[in-house]
Design a protein with these regions (language model features):
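Residue-level signal for mature regions of secreted extracellular proteins and peptides
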Residues: 7, 35-37, 103
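N-terminal signal peptide c-region/cleavage motif recognized by signal peptidases
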Residues: 13-16
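N-terminal secretory signal peptides
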Residues: 20-66
Length: 141
């Protein structure tokens, strides 16, 4: 009997560990407007990387996965995001001291976009509802 009880307790404690191990819990805690900014950064990195690279594919899929946790205006949002990315991704960064012709500084362009006033203004507009809320606030358990 003691073995059965011990086994049940072990099973229950193991199940609770896996139940609380949510790999996207960090995303669910972020304000929607922050997740949109992260979507834009991921998408920008996907677009500036070699389109056949594993990194580009991973960044694109990460961007798409983040959309699962945001009430995103899909009809207007994608075009607005892509237009803003296109504005930033082609900038030339000639000021870098180690710049070689094949080095364009595209990661820097994506970071510049991420911290831009334009993205700070756009991100809340792409949310259906309150951009300061989080997924957890809107989906209590």
């Amino acid at each position: 009997m003691k073995k059965i009880i011990a086994s049940l307790l072990l099973l229950i404690s193991s199940a609770s560990v896996y139940a609380t191990d949510d790999p996207v819990s960090f995303v669910k805690k972020l304000p929607y407007k922050q997740v949109v900014k992260d979507i834009v950064l991921s998408r920008c990195l996907a677009q500036v990387a070699d389109d056949k690279s594993q990194f580009s594919l991973d960044a694109a899929r990460s961007s798409n996965a983040l959309l699962e946790w945001v009430p995103f205006d899909i009809e207007n949002g994608n075009d607005k995001i892509n237009a803003l990315i296109n504005k930033y991704k082609g900038a030339t960064n000639a000021f870098h001291s180690e710049r070689k012709p094949e080095v364009q500084g595209v990661t820097l362009n994506c970071l510049r976009l991420y911290y831009s006033d334009e993205l700070n203004k756009l991100a809340p507009q792409l949310i259906i509802g309150n951009p300061d809320r989080t997924w957890i606030q809107d989906n209590p358990q």
